[in-house]
Amino acid sequence: MIKIAVCGAAGRMGQRLINSVQEAEGVCLSGVLERPAHPLVGQDAGLVAGCGALGVSISDDLNAVIAGCDVLIDFTAPKVSLKNLEACGLQRKSIVIGSTGFTPEERQLAMELTRNISAILAPNMSVGVNVCFKILKDIAATLGDDFDVEIVESHHRMKVDAPSGTAVRMGQVVAEALGRDYDRVANFHREGITGSRTKDEIGMQTIRGGDIVGEHTVYFIGMGERIELSHRAMNRDMFSRGAVRAATWVVGQAPGLYDMQDVLGLK
């Protein structure tokens, strides 16, 4: 039985994670973490998540929660995730990170912090999205430079980073398949007299509003034809189920930083 702890019990993802751990086979909820002095600290995690009393109280003691688990699932923010990753490293415990908005420097630090533990850092835990990453690579490599690429992503009004980590990864996958430098060709701004579209650029458009869970569409636009690859998240359960799947996979893996492509055998 793999013991899973969840970070961020008060959040929407944290609550879905608690439910998904309870529904999965071969795992159990060993601990739930919230920030110090949060009003939910001390309450039963199952009651907070709406799945009935579990006998697991929400804690604000990071080290104690990590000590009691085999793997920690973290959907918070980059700075918090890196702190939790470092704490897991000190206790030789695995971690699954679903936070988005990491800078290149923060990703590099994450790699350095996984010298002694196995960890997963992925912008999207959905199985469907990760299959899309693989499909995008094949489409881009086949079409080559004859098609323009544009990416449109939509999320709820509360999302704090833009573009989404998933959209960025989609752009990186396409750029890699086409032999382009993503940081150079990604275009996030079009306004006024922009001139003609450059051949290499990958456009990135962001929509924020309401309660959209997450939608991504990649357009491959040619002369007289267009291919659209879309993924729409109907709820957060697919993210939480994917995270639990990742947690069961990462325990026992060799030290290093992995992603969902590794979990699903898509590399």
Curated annotation (Swiss-Prot):
Taxonomy, superkingdom: Bacteria
Entry's transmembrane regions: none
Binding positions for NAD(+) per the UniProt entry: G8, A9, A10, G11, R12, M13, E34, G98, S99, T100, A122, P123, N124, M125
Pathway terms, separated by semicolons: Amino-acid biosynthesis; L-lysine biosynthesis via DAP pathway; (S)-tetrahydrodipicolinate from L-aspartate: step 4/4
One of the Pfam families matching this protein, by short name: DapB_N
Residues engaged in binding NADP(+): R35
UniProt family annotation: Belongs to the DapB family.
Name of the protein in question: 4-hydroxy-tetrahydrodipicolinate reductase
Species of the source: Pelobacter propionicus (strain DSM 2379 / NBRC 103807 / OttBd1)
Gene label: dapB
